[in-house]
């Protein structure tokens, strides 16, 4: 559904001290502290019109103020990788969600299949590293 916020789900490769919550979109930290969060998404469009995408972090069900990343694709078949890093202060038991929305059914997150010369690529990635407590 267009113009609707969705949480991305990550179920593999969680680091020590970070686990999946319920639902699986929740990434729960076991220790409080300052965390650097690195996010990337490969976005694509099948429209010749402009398609806009929004991405932002949500902590404990609340959107992080001033954190939205907005990107637009302007042609049919366009693909772009977008990324951002943020530092968040989290308390033990807090959960982080990566949220996204798009304004057209022609826009989508694009996981690329492997080719004869390159490996597959996920549609999105996230890494969460505790800097200090």
Regions inferred by a protein language model and the residue ranges of each:
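Beta-strand signatures of extracellular beta-sandwich domains
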Residues: 54-58, 97
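Extracellular beta-strand-rich recognition modules
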Residues: 33-43, 81-85, 93-101
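Terminal (often C-terminal
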Residues: 1-50, 63, 67-70, 105-133
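Glycine-rich strand-loop-strand elements at beta-sheet edges
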Residues: 63-91
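Compositionally biased, intrinsically disordered linkers/stalks adjacent to structured regions
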Residues: 88-116
